[in-house]
Design a protein with these regions (language model features):
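Short loop/turn motifs that connect adjacent beta-strands in outer-membrane beta-barrel proteins
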Residues: 41-47, 99, 138-148, 183-192, ...
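Transmembrane beta-strands of outer-membrane beta-barrel pores
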Residues: 52-58, 97-99, 108-112, 135-137, ...
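Long, well-ordered mid-to-C-terminal structural blocks that present hydrophobic/aromatic surfaces
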Residues: 80-168
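Membrane-embedded beta-strand positions in outer-membrane beta-barrel channels/transporters
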Residues: 35-37, 88-90, 128-132, 175-179, ...
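Outer-membrane beta-barrel "beta-signal"
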Residues: 248-261
Length: 261
């Protein structure tokens, strides 16, 4: 258990923990988590938010204890650890420019676990800037309406240099989500075609699933009947990037059925 959290560069194709004892895991406390938020809406209808939270990691980090043997590091025990007291602070805004809703957020995670060059999780500080927006188009020749959402991001590990981490100390990318809407195609039936594309342009930060050159493309078809029944199918393809892209084999088909009453 837990091998998926070891980067491929650390575990390699031949890495295994067979015969290595698992020691007692370090679970997170059930208490000590809290958060606060403050919002201010200006006269121009711009929403400005300030947030702060303290929480515990919801996914385990794998810690391996090594000993030197004939000049080689040999694993002698391992455990899963849930890091506590991760602090998050963020400032955000939401406004309207022309006919486009624009949002932005600058967030900083302090003492979040990240894998260093030894393969061990260490507490680091991660800053992330996100700018995005949503624009709605009216009827066209090939649709009744279109909603386009977009977002760009830049992340930087502010507390560590690239040489101290198993991957890079930065990452950047963008994503676009477009939904084509078709009204009353059949009596009582509306349809939509959701299309999602994500491209990690540069840099690798595995903890936020950003892999340089990696791409995700998802195309689906959804149907709605009288606002009660919904059915949909979508195919998602993961491609691009090099062997650091741990998501490259995750292609899948998703089928959803939903009824509201």
């Amino acid at each position: 258990p837990g091998l998926a959290f070891i980067p491929e560069e650390i575990r390699g194709n031949e890495f295994n923990l067979f015969g290595v004892p698992r020691t007692r895991d370090e679970d997170a406390s059930d208490s000590g988590q809290w958060g606060a938020a403050f919002h201010y809406v200006t006269e121009g209808n711009t929403d400005i938010g300030v947030y702060h939270a303290v929480g515990h990691d919801k996914k385990p980090s794998l810690e391996i204890t090594y000993e030197e043997l004939f000049g080689q590091r040999i694993p002698v025990s391992y455990r899963q650890r849930y890091f506590e007291d991760i602090r998050g602070t963020a400032v955000s805004f939401t406004t309207v420019i022309g006919e486009t809703n624009v949002t932005g957020e600058l967030s900083i995670l302090e003492d979040t676990p990240m894998v260093d060059t030894s393969g061990d999780p260490q507490r680091e500080d991660l800053a992330k800037l996100q700018i995005g927006g949503t624009h709605v188009l009216g009827p066209g020749a090939f649709w009744d309406d279109v909603t386009v959402s977009f977002e760009g991001f830049y992340a930087n590990v502010t507390s560590a240099a690239e040489r101290d981490l198993i991957a890079d100390d930065y990452a950047m990318g963008y994503s676009v989500f477009t939904t084509l809407g078709y009204k009353n195609v059949f009596p009582g039936w509306d349809f939509e075609v959701p299309i999602f594309f994500k491209h990690d342009v540069s840099g690798v930060i595995q903890e936020i699933q950003a892999y340089s050159g990696a791409k995700v493309l998802s195309v689906g078809l959804g149907g709605f009947y009288l606002n009660n029944f919904r059915a949909g199918i979508a195919y998602s393809a993961y491609f691009g990037g090099d062997r650091k892209n741990l998501l490259r084999d995750r292609d899948h088909i998703a089928v959803t059925l939903k009824y509201s009453f």
